[in-house]
Regions:
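Short Fe-S-cluster ligation motifs
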Residues: 91-109
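Iron-sulfur (Fe-S) cluster-binding segments and ferredoxin-like electron-carrier domains
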Residues: 30-31, 71-85
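Beta-strand segments within the central parallel beta-sheet cores of soluble alpha/beta enzyme folds
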Residues: 85-91
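Short helix-capping/linker segments at secondary-structure and domain boundaries
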Residues: 64-68, 101-103, 111
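Short, thiol/selenol-centered motifs that function as redox-active sites or metal-ligating centers
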Residues: 55, 59-71
């Protein structure tokens, strides 16, 4: 088999199917992206799988991508996410966008904000639970 066929076989072994959207992209793109997706989205990494899916779900909510939301929700549940956790992710996703909108609407000075964030971060380091 050639590299493309090997990639398709690896996808099938991983997902049980080769999704049509993966066949629809250019072959060279799939051959390049699949190993990265498999390693960082599906494999062992420094971030546990469920948390990676939470990150993906929060991002997909903010970019309003129904495809991404569906995939990351299903994968989060498949990795043991509870309804309470999913609800918290939904809140956090909306909260980040909300505060971003407020800061932009206020036209809050970015240099001031940067200094304040550093102060907050230093305080968090000192008071973090060990």
């Amino acid at each position: 088999m050639g590299k493309y066929e090997d990639t398709l076989e690896d996808i099938k072994q991983t997902f049980g199917i080769v999704p049509g959207f993966m066949k629809a992209i250019p072959k060279d793109v799939l051959m390049q992206d699949w190993p990265l997706m498999k390693k960082y989205q599906l494999g062992e990494s420094k971030i546990p799988a469920k948390y990676r899916e939470f990150i993906g779900l929060a991002i997909s909510a903010n970019i309003k991508c129904p495809y991404c939301s569906l995939m990351h929700t299903a994968m989060a549940v498949g990795n043991g996410a509870t309804q309470d956790e999913m609800a918290e992710v939904a809140f956090l996703a909306s909260y980040t966008a909300r505060w971003s909108a407020m800061l932009h609407a206020l036209q809050y000075n970015y240099d001031t904000f940067t200094k304040e964030v550093h102060q907050i971060s230093e305080h968090a380091k000192k008071t973090a639970r060990k």
